[in-house]
Each structure stands twice: as C-alpha cells, then as structure tokens.
C-alpha cells in the first residue's frame, strides 16, 4: 500500500439509500446570495429563505457531504431533504432547537 492510495469500489454509490425524502420549494426573498451546506439543519437556515419550516424540522439537504446549495437573490427552486439520523439531537446552528427533535 502506498500512503494516500485509494481503493475505490466499482459502480455508483447511492446517497442516503432507503431513507425517506421530502421535496420543498424554497425561495430567496433577500438581496444577498444564501448558501446552505450539506449537513446544516434546514429548519434553521437564513430567514431570507422562504418555505414551510414546520415541514422540514429535523431535516438536511440530500446532497453529497461537503457540498452546498446556493440560492441567489430572487431564486426559487425545489430541494430534496432527508431526516437527520442518529440520536436526533440538534445543537448550535442558529440555536432554535438546542436538544432533542
């Protein structure tokens, strides 16, 4: 083995296989771009993003880890979300939960 050597599997990797998803229409009502990372608790994103927040409590974007979605001012698009898993406790972000979902 060579340091840093990779042994990739063949074929495609399906993200969040078997997990329930929700599609939500999101609009940036602000005058600045808003970027949301892959593991950010979507319920707590920038208030300039308009959508049904109650529907997305405990969810994050269904995109590869380390990536993000950018909403330009006036943009409206549909995003796919998946539930947070594990202990389903949320701390930090914008401080709206600070505990169990």
Swiss-Prot record:
Listed GO MF terms: urease activity
Catalytic activity: urea + 2 H2O + H(+) = hydrogencarbonate + 2 NH4(+)
Main EC class the enzyme belongs to: hydrolase
Predominant subcellular localization, coarse grouping: cytoplasm
Cellular compartments annotated: Cytoplasm
Origin: domain of life: Bacteria
EC number(s) on file: 3.5.1.5
An individual GO BP term: urea catabolic process
Single GO cellular component term: urease complex
Family the UniProt entry places it in: Belongs to the urease beta subunit family.
Subunit structure: Heterotrimer of UreA (gamma), UreB (beta) and UreC (alpha) subunits. Three heterotrimers associate to form the active enzyme.
Name of the protein in its database record: Urease subunit beta
């Amino acid at each position: 083995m060579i340091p840093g050597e990779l042994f990739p599997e063949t074929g495609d990797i399906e993200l969040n296989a078997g997990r329930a998803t929700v599609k939500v229409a999101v609009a940036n009502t602000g005058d600045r771009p808003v970027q949301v990372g892959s593991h950010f608790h979507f319920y707590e994103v920038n208030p300039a993003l308009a959508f049904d927040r109650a529907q997305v409590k405990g969810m994050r974007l269904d995109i590869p880890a380390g990536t993000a979605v950018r909403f330009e001012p006036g943009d409206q698009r549909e995003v796919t979300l998946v539930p947070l898993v594990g202990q389903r406790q949320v701390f930090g972000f914008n401080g709206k939960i600070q505990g169990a979902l």
